[in-house]
């Protein structure tokens, strides 16, 4: 009963998030966020709550990077991607969070890569649709990736699956970068 109650609560919360995102009523609170520390905290949180023996790690530049973002929404996106990767990565597998700066496109590219079961190429676009679940035996509402996509798009970015990665799945999303006033001079 407890598990079903939690799933129902999550479903209601997810449906409300989708509705607010689509109507433009979801508020974004932008601030300068130091990415290395923020991402390390997400990895720590994910490792603390994981129920499998997969290795979850951070692979990124160690120098601080300030990103103008809604840090809670960014955390929601990344935690969702990490948790999804955990659902499909067997014990002994690995999950990596990474980011790079694409100066040419003026965006940050985040990726969550796993060594799990992967996603068939003909199903890759489906995973971003509402209530779409490729595996009915895995818990979830089928709204997490739809929420990620809507949130990322509202933040000015996009999300996709790296079709060239064949050792599991790699989700990549872009986030616009904004220069700080001190950097513009």
List the predicted regions and their residue ranges.
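Short alpha-helical segment of the dimerization/phosphotransfer core of two-component systems
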Residues: 3-8
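Helix-loop junction within the histidine kinase core
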Residues: 19-30
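A conserved beta-strand-to-alpha-helix junction within the catalytic ATP-binding
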Residues: 29-44, 75
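Short conserved segments within the C-terminal catalytic ATPase subdomain
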Residues: 49-58
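Short conserved segment of the HATPase_c
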Residues: 119-131
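Short alpha-helical Gxxx[C/S/T] motif in the catalytic ATP-binding
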Residues: 144, 148
């Amino acid at each position: 009963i407890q598990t079903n109650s939690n799933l129902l609560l999550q479903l209601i919360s997810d449906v409300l998030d989708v509705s607010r995102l689509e109507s433009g009523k979801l508020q974004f609170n932008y601030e300068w966020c130091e990415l290395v520390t923020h991402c390390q905290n997400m990895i720590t949180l994910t490792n603390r709550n994981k129920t499998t023996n997969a290795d979850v790690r951070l692979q990124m530049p160690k120098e601080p990077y300030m990103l103008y973002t809604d840090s809670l929404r960014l955390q929601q996106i990344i935690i969702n991607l990490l948790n999804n990767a955990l659902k499909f990565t067997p014990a002994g597998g690995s999950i990596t969070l990474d980011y790079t700066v694409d100066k040419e496109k003026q965006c940050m590219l985040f990726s969550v890569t796993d060594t799990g079961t992967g996603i068939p190429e003909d199903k890759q676009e489906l995973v971003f649709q509402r209530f779409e679940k490729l595996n009915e035996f895995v818990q979830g509402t089928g709204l997490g990736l739809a929420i990620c996509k809507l949130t990322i798009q509202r933040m000015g970015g996009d999300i996709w699956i790296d079709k060239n990665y064949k050792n599991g799945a790699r989700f990549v999303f872009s986030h616009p970068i904004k220069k700080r006033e001190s950097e513009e001079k």
